[in-house]
Amino acid sequence: MIEQIKSSEIKKFIEKNPNTVLLHVRKEDEWNTVGKPISDSLGIKNFFITISQDSGFIESVKKEINKENQILVMCAAGGRSIIAANLLQNEGYNTYNVSDGFSGNGQDLGWKNYGLPTN
């Protein structure tokens, strides 16, 4: 089962888990129109790898991210990221779903609206 993390909890999570990375799985056109998170100022690396059918998602992640990392997986509102987090957990990765995503999920603010750094 994937642990759910709200954007409001991310800074505290990173403090406790310095080996954390942020994996953003939205499509590139979404990054360009809505914005994208910048996690460098929080002391963690950003990875932008889109999840879609037959996209080679797992292989792309394997090339970029170590299995020793804690991976915060994010999309717009938490739906695609939970799918990605489950796929990666099945491959042996330590994944956590950012449940309110980048833009919020109707209950919680999301990365952007919580005031975390964006581009």
Q: What is each residue range found by the language model?
A:
Residues H24:
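Conserved active-site aspartate in kinases
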Residues V73-M74:
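Short, surface-exposed ligand- or partner-binding patches at beta-edge/loop junctions that are enriched
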